């Protein structure tokens, strides 16, 4: 492992020197390094990188759509907070969480709503959605944001093409495993979902999974996600207050320690959101460089990979470290 890390860092230093010698005429050196790293993912990898102060950027598979998985919770949060900015919603507004609101997958609310009676504020739900990627909180907030169409329309209003939100997580996961029809409200039970997930795959579920990775719904290109992160950081997507709130919550994200943050220098501040479903593994966020060198938005996606989660995470970690070091060494 140490030898692998050394060789990776040595290669990174080499591209920094090359970039410096070309007086920053484009970021071809960084793009070549991202291309070199891509096979580590074991599948199709997409990366969007933007140095936020200078606008310098580099991409790998820039305009290829990737399933967002839970990274789509960032655009959902943007539309939700836009409604707060417009006075249509209040962060203190309480939302009752009922048993039939349960959505399977990641999160903590499933353990709290086996009996009715729980109510949380929109701000509480926002933090749970982003900090621990809670799917029940996500679906409740997507409803308050007006649904996927409203989120997608908001992205287009910001000038972002290539990012769309279509389904609540309940339906997204159901499509991934080939569960049809989606259970009605009376049938939404955590134990029942656990039984479905633990059952052996069938021909139908395998076919559903294969189709899932090419489904245009709930997908984003690396260019589009990087653009959203850039607008969020520049306070162009939301009011300064809402922008600060969202970025603060993303800095406290509790998932994905081995992804964007995986091999960055200790103490590097990262505001990010992860996403994982099947053969898809993602992490998108903003890195703070040391010594006043600025900030870097990184949107990293992997799809159609049969490698272990650890190995896919390593590919994203290498891409993030490469972007971090590149701009650290080449920013004047």
Model regions and ranges:
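Active-site-proximal helix/loop microenvironment
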Residues: 67, 163-241
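A short small-residue
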Residues: 56-57, 112-114, 207-210, 300-302
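Bacterial N-terminal signal peptides that target proteins for export
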Residues: 2-12
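Active-site-adjacent loops and short helices of periplasmic peptidoglycan-processing enzymes
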Residues: 26-177
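Structured C-terminal helix/loop/strand segments within mature extracytoplasmic catalytic/sensor domains
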Residues: 27-35, 148, 210, 214-332
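Bacterial N-terminal signal peptides
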Residues: 11-21
């Amino acid at each position: 492992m140490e030898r692998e890390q050394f060789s990776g860092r040595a290669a990174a230093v080499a591209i920094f020197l090359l970039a410096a010698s070309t007086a920053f005429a484009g970021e071809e050196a960084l793009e070549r390094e991202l291309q070199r790293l891509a096979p580590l993912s074991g599948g199709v990898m997409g990366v969007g990188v933007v140095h936020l102060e200078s606008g310098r950027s580099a991409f790998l598979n820039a305009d290829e759509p990737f399933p967002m998985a839970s990274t789509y919770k960032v655009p959902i949060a943007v539309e939700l907070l836009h409604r707060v900015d417009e006075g249509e919603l209040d962060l203190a507004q309480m939302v009752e969480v009922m048993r039939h609101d349960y959505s399977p997958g990641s999160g903590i609310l499933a353990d709290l709503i086996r009996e009715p009676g729980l109510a949380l504020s929109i701000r509480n739900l926002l933090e749970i959605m982003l900090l621990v990627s809670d799917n029940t909180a996500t679906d409740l907030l997507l409803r308050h944001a007006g649904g996927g169409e409203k989120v997608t329309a908001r992205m287009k209003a910001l000038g972002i093409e290539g990012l769309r939100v279509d389904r609540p997580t309940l339906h997204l996961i159901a499509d991934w495993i080939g569960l049809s029809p989606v259970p009605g409200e009376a049938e939404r039970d955590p134990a029942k979902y656990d039984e479905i997930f633990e059952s052996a795959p069938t021909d139908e579920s395998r076919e559903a999974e294969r189709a899932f990775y090419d489904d245009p719904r709930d997908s984003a290109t690396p260019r589009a996600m990087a653009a959203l992160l850039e607008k969020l950081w520049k306070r162009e997507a939301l009011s300064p207050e809402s922008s600060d709130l969202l970025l603060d919550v993303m800095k406290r994200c509790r998932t994905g320690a081995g992804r964007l943050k995986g091999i960055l220098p200790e103490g590097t501040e990262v505001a990010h959101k992860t996403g994982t479903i099947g053969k898809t593994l993602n992490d998108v966020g903003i890195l703070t460089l040391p010594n006043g060198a600025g900030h870097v938005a990184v949107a990293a996606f992997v799809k159609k990979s049969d490698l272990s989660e650890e190995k896919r995470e390593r590919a994203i970690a290498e891409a993030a470290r490469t972007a971090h070091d590149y701009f650290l060494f080449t920013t004047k």
